[in-house]
């Protein structure tokens, strides 16, 4: 029976090659598009390092405020500041961990003194960030709470940035300029895929070491590890 099906299909191909070619191409394209959509969706939800616990994450990207005097349906929406994030989420008892970090990476120049600068993607975080996300360290370690609270200028960088600046991944303890300010490397991690859109960056620093402060609010995002 199966042999007969193949024989009939082959005969059909020979009798109407153009129609058969269009049918085969259309079927292949439809399958390809379905697979592409499935893969794109899978990338968004499937756990992989450093976002291995995606199924336990709750992200708070933006907040909204409204006022009766503004009228029905009118509101102001946007990322939250540090004070708001701390007041609303750091005191929660249900999450295993709560991390606060800038809501997007910012292209920032890095270089060694006397050398041309190059742009990298910078993310400013707290110390809990390194508990929530599982980065693969090849050298050194992340900054801890004491370093974060003190606002020390330290940074975790990727392997590619380490090689670009120092021509080696053995960069712990070495100094470089981040946006013209001196920073010391505390750790080096494996490069992170841009598909890990929450944890992705090329350089991570404590937000207490920059111009961000409790009186100068910047847009921040919060991730709750449930």
Language-model segments: which ranges?
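Short, Lys/Arg-rich, polar N-terminal cytosolic tail immediately upstream
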Residues: 1-3
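A short amphipathic helical element positioned immediately N-terminal to and/or at the very start
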Residues: 5-14
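Short, strongly hydrophobic transmembrane alpha-helices
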Residues: 16-44
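Membrane-proximal extracellular/periplasmic loop immediately following the first transmembrane helix
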Residues: 37-108, 218
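Extracytoplasmic/periplasmic beta-strand context in beta-sandwich domains
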Residues: 56-58, 120, 141, 174
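Short acidic/polar micro-motifs at solvent-exposed secondary-structure junctions
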Residues: 63-78, 87, 99-128, 142-154, ...
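Mid-to-C-terminal secondary-structure elements
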Residues: 126-143, 153-224
């Amino acid at each position: 029976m199966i042999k007969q099906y193949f024989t009939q299909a082959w005969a059909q191909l020979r009798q109407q090659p153009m129609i058969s070619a269009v049918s085969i191409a259309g079927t292949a394209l439809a399958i390809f598009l379905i697979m592409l959509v499935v893969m794109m969706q899978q990338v968004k939800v499937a756990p992989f390092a450093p976002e291995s616990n995606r199924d336990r994450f709750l992200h708070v990207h933006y907040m909204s405020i409204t006022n009766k005097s503004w009228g029905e349906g009118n509101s102001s929406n946007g990322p939250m500041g540090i004070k708001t994030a701390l007041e609303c989420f750091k005191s929660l008892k249900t999450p295993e961990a709560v991390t606060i970090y800038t809501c997007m990476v910012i292209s920032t120049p890095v270089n060694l003194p006397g050398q041309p600068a190059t742009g990298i993607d910078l993310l400013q975080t707290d110390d809990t960030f390194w508990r929530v996300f599982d980065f693969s360290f090849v050298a050194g370690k992340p900054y801890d709470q004491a370093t974060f609270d003190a606002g020390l200028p330290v940074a975790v960088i990727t392997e590619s940035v380490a090689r670009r600046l120092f021509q080696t991944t053995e960069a712990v303890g070495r100094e470089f300029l981040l946006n013209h300010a001196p920073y010391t490397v505390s750790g080096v991690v494996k490069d992170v895929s841009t598909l890990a859109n929450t944890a992705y960056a090329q350089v991570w620093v404590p937000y207490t070491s920059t111009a961000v402060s409790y009186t100068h609010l910047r847009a921040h995002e919060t991730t709750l590890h449930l």
